[in-house]
Amino acid sequence: AAIRQDLLREGPKGSMWAAYTDDDGALVGWEERGSRWRGFSTGGEKVLFRLGSTDASRVCVTEAAIDAMSLADLEGSRPDSLYVATGGGWSPATEVALRRLASRPETLLVAATDADAQGEIYAERIRKMAEETGCRRLRLSPVQRDWNLMLQEKKGRGERWEEWAEGALPPDRRPPRG
């Protein structure tokens, strides 16, 4: 689904680059994830990675794009769901974008953050946001540390996505260079 939505590129050494967009769908940055490193594009803005229908009533908030994609896979990419990621941070632009989504009528804001201390901090922020905007809320916590680990367990793999992704994206999906 992420490839069909043109959200992924292959970076150096088989790394995954996930597109972050603003409310109008304009590209504002890339979350970069390699086998031994993580980062965000220099000069990019952490708004949201968005996978799924932009008018979905259910908004699942994860920390990383790989977890948003993993949760979508585990749930069968529910048509009523928009899977978003914050890039492991919570910028002012992220706050504004999430509030816009939470303020829509009939929104269910799902805190699908990691099952660790940082994930609980984000889940609490999401809970408060839901209360402030008047939307419904739910805490969906992975049994493993994160959704990617759960997906790998389900699929019977011992390795993480990053370890087998090298070359997985076609050449036309690679990030612009230069």
Model segments located where?
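Basic, glycine-enriched DNA-binding surface that flanks or lies within the catalytic cores of DNA
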Residues: 1-45, 50-53
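Short active-site oxyanion
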Residues: 55-60, 108-109
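Helix N-cap/beta->alpha junction signal
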Residues: 63-64
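Conserved Rossmann-like nucleotide-cofactor binding loop
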Residues: 67
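TOPRIM fold recognition
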Residues: 73-178
